[in-house]
Amino acid sequence: MDVSDVTSRYNDRLRVTDYADAATNGLQVGPGDRSVERIAFAVDAAAATISDAVEWGADLLVVHHGVAWGGLDAVTGREYDRIAALVDGECALYAAHLPLDGHPELGNAAHVADVLGLTQRSPFGDHSGEQIGLQGQLPDPTSAPALSKSLAAALPTGDQPVQVLDVGPAELTDVAVVTGSGADWLREAEANGVDALVTGEGKGKLYHEAREAGVSVFLAGHYATETGGVRALEAVADDWGVETRFISHPTGL
């Protein structure tokens, strides 16, 4: 198996060409004909995760947040350092951003939905015609504090509490999920009649918008809500006869 084989398999599974994305989805760094025996997985292609991948001897690093956003006009500074570390370490880089957010089985939103036990799921979070989230029903009506505890227990939030804007119904049933920075989908949540929106991080105007919409919002951390997708890709690769390793590097954000 070489880098092109891995790239093709993930590209097809995630439908990477169907998404309008600021990120470059697919192979970002490295030759396609390099043999792959070890694949490392991480949320972010940062200096720390690249260093860990190279030290382990990874032939390929698979991430959610890569190094190419809207094209690369210049490769200098920290961008140069990251790419140089990959090239010098003979480690290719594959990234899947929005396609990994919204995949109904492998995606970040699907992982959070699994954590919450959501049933009757349907696509949510329209982004240029593709859906990057999910909505569904909780197994039982749940209070905001109880839902917050469930998220904190199941996601790698570290010492950071799940922030809760408890401005919706006292008992929550219908929940929408857009991981990472998903506060912009509050209006869609309101339009769909859900009781709560689970995402990673918010914006200053979110409190009043959520309060006026009557939709509770749970901010569980950008990193914490987006580990599930790359872990799912790791599980897929485990069946390919290669060594895999997840590099955990929580940001607390």
Curated annotation (Swiss-Prot):
Coiled coil: none
Domain of life: Archaea
Keyword Transmembrane carried by entry: no
Positions of a divalent metal cation 2 binding: H65, H222, E226
Record field: transmembrane: none
Keywords: Metal-binding
Disulfide bonds: none
Record: residues binding a divalent metal cation 1: H64, D101, E226
Claim: Nucleotide-binding is one of the keywords in the record: no
GO-annotated cellular components: cytoplasm
Gene3D superfamilies documented for this protein: NIF3 (NGG1p interacting factor 3)-like (3.40.1390.30)
GO molecular function: metal ion binding
Family stated for the protein in its record: Belongs to the GTP cyclohydrolase I type 2/NIF3 family.
Assembly, per entry: Homohexamer.
Protein's name according to its UniProt entry: GTP cyclohydrolase 1 type 2 homolog
